[in-house]
């Protein structure tokens, strides 16, 4: 039996607001933004929501290690992304700021659980502050059957990361070795 199988866990609904504070992005005049080094996250369905890089001047800067949630957008409504670095958010995106110490792997797992529900949202039914407060996600239960199993979520996402990265790392190593043997390295 695979101890990291999602099917082998008991699950329970939790409110997003149990674990996150919410803050809506405030960049709404995209044409006036000057180019810089601060990532700008918009309601895109690709590229982790990154639209470009803007100047930090007079911008609300959100810290990294949070989730962003597309409120509406180009088919991306309901998609959640883990954001590792500081960023600016456009007005079609909400920041989900952890209330407690959630790490990268916890946030990746929760973003996956949120995104699984994205079909509920779209231009006719966007995410707003009331819907965010009422938003529930299913999470695996810990041994106490009351709280989420954060350790399981971390181990599950670490394994996923390893499985996804391993082929790319092996390919890169082969290229580097090949380049070293044939010269030019």
Model segments located where?
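Non-catalytic DNA-recognition/assembly elements of restriction-modification systems
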Residues: 1-26, 34-48, 143-185
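General detector of folded, globular domains
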Residues: 9-16, 40-41, 68, 80-82, ...
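Short secondary-structure capping/turn segments at boundaries of alpha-helices and beta-strands
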Residues: 25-29, 53-56
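A conserved ligand/cofactor-binding region detector
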Residues: 31, 72, 104, 112, ...
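Short, tandemly repeated low-complexity microdomains enriched for cysteine and small residues
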Residues: 53-56, 122-128, 163-174
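A short beta-sheet element
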Residues: 53-112
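A short glycine-rich beta-alpha junction/loop motif
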Residues: 87-93, 124-143
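A generic structural motif
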Residues: 99-102, 141-145
């Amino acid at each position: 039996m695979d101890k990291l199988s999602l099917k082998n866990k008991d699950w329970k609904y939790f409110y997003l607001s149990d674990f996150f504070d919410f803050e809506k992005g405030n960049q709404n005049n995209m044409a006036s933004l000057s180019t810089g080094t601060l990532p700008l996250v918009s309601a895109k369905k690709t590229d982790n929501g990154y639209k470009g890089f803007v100047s930090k001047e007079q911008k609300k800067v959100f810290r990294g290690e949070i989730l962003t949630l597309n409120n509406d957008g180009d088919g991306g409504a309901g998609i959640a992304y883990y954001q590792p670095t500081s960023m600016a958010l456009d007005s079609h995106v909400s920041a989900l700021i952890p209330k407690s110490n959630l790490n990268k792997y916890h946030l990746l797992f929760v973003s996956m659980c949120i995104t699984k529900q994205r079909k509920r949202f779209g231009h006719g039914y966007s995410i707003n502050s009331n819907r965010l407060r009422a938003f529930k996600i299913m999470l695996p239960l810990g041994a106490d059957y009351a709280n989420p199993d954060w350790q399981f979520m971390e181990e599950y996402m670490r394994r996923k990361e390893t499985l996804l990265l391993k082929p790319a790392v092996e390919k890169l190593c082969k290229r580097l070795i090949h380049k070293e043997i044939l010269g030019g390295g």
